[in-house]
């Protein structure tokens, strides 16, 4: 394949991915159906959402936003425990809690948890964080699975079979996941995706997810403090190369190799396309 054809292929793939992103964004809904009352909720270290919110605070988010986010997440978690306690299976529990989530937190994309939870909206991965806490509060365990541009739930059902739940369907009220749906569950060769992950893993990965929402100094600090296993994820590679002032020929070769597995990465595709254009190397 010539470089010109390769460049054209990258642009076509990026166009397709941009279309997927637009379709995801089009799910955004209006205001929440249930307004959460304001209280002076305290930080609760046992909840994943509260720990992630605190990480936002450590990265410069205003405390007024942090306080409201803590309040709203606690209200949801305790409401879910009260209203969904009669659920006899994890599936029933997810139907109940996700419906409640959709009422309190309509769908809207956000990299950081705090501004989203504080303003009563949520997206795919933020939904999972809320439901992990609600499940744990009710003595159940669920996990997150990352897909390209998406995240959903995995759990072991009452028959000891792994099952999957899509949190964003039905106006953010959820339904059983159909992994054959290529719109949500895009195919990729990278082994980071489609593996159940624990809340500890989420905490380790979260700084990468918010890196584009902080200043450049914090971004470098975030990358330098990542655990070695997280630095090997496709998202961390995107972060690493995005911080470089200039992509070298060696960088371009490495990005090209990474794209063989991480075929859905629009960041890597754009970096490589930019490199070829800048160097006038399209033949």
Q: For the regions a protein language model found, what residue spans apply to each?
A:
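Positively charged n-region of N-terminal signal peptides that target proteins for export
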Residues: 1-5
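Intrinsically disordered, low-complexity segments enriched in polar/charged small residues
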Residues: 8-9, 23
């Amino acid at each position: 394949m010539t470089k010109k054809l390769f460049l054209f292929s990258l642009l076509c793939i990026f166009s397709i991915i941009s279309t997927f992103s637009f379709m995801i964004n089009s799910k955004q809904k209006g205001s929440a159906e249930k307004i959460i009352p304001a209280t002076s909720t305290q930080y609760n270290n046992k909840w994943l959402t509260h720990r992630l919110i605190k990480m936002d605070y450590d990265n410069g988010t205003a405390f007024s936003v942090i306080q409201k986010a803590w309040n709203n997440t606690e209200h949801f978690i305790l409401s879910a425990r009260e209203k969904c306690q009669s659920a006899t299976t994890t599936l029933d529990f997810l139907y109940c809690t996700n419906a409640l989530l959709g009422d309190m937190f309509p769908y809207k994309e956000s990299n950081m948890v705090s501004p989203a939870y504080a303003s009563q909206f949520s997206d795919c991965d933020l939904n999972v964080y809320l439901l992990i806490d609600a499940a744990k509060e009710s003595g159940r365990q669920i996990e997150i699975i990352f897909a390209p541009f998406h995240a959903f739930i995995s759990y072991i059902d009452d028959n000891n079979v792994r099952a999957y739940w899509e949190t964003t369907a039905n106006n953010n009220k959820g339904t059983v996941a159909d992994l054959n749906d290529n719109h949500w569950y895009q195919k990729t060769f990278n082994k980071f995706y489609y593996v159940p992950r624990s809340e500890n893993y989420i905490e380790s990965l979260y700084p990468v997810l918010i890196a584009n929402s902080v200043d450049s100094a914090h971004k470098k600090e975030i990358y330098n403090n990542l655990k070695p296993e997280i630095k090997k994820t496709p998202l961390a590679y995107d972060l690493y190369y995005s911080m470089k002032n200039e992509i070298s020929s060696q960088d371009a070769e490495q990005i090209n190799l990474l794209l063989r597995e991480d075929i859905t990465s629009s960041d890597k595709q754009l970096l490589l396309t930019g490199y070829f254009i800048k160097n006038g190397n399209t033949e």
